[in-house]
Amino acid sequence: MIKKSIFAVASAALAVGCTAVAAEAADIFTLESTTFADGKMMPKKVANSKANMATNPNCVGDDISPQFSWRNVPDGTKSLVFLMIDPEGRGGAGVNHWVAYGISPSVTGFAEGEVSKPSDKYVGGKSTQGVAFYSGPCTPPNQMAHHYTFDLIATDLAPTELPPGLTREEVTAKLAPPAQPPAHTKGVAGMVGLFVNPWHE
């Protein structure tokens, strides 16, 4: 009888612990996409196109921006920043493919192709390619897959706080000024998408 009681108590404690972990996981600031899975190869259509980048033969796609959705934005968030970076681009110097900010916390995602052009849902910054909207991968051929990182940053800055046309470096400097702690960030959610040229799944 004592053994059964101990087992029952242990089982109940385990159940409570699992429930608490599940509840905590449900509250995590999360970025997701129906276009690709985190850490997996992205479809060819998200790569930049020859129509946009006629002088770059490495652009083999249709420049269709991925679908994104997010949930559990941290309390106190006043605006969101979205950054897309290829850290292996330009021989390791990095390429900023998309810089967007001033996104209202009431926005919960972007449809596929929605940010391949300017949108009133965000303030456009300035990518390495010099545009204010999504610019897809132009991965050099015959290299290992590049890791395209997508970071959604919650901030305490008002949506109109940052002017249009800022680079990624200028945005991050505004978010975390070195001489003026604390940072203006409330949390971050991210994904990584892979792309290789020649493309294959």
Locations of regions flagged by a protein language model:
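Bacterial N-terminal signal peptides
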Residues: 8-17
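Intrinsically disordered, low-complexity repeat segments enriched in small/polar residues
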Residues: 6-7, 22
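Positively charged n-region of N-terminal signal peptides that target proteins for export
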Residues: 1-5
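N-terminus-centered regions that define maturation/targeting leaders and the start
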Residues: 22-201
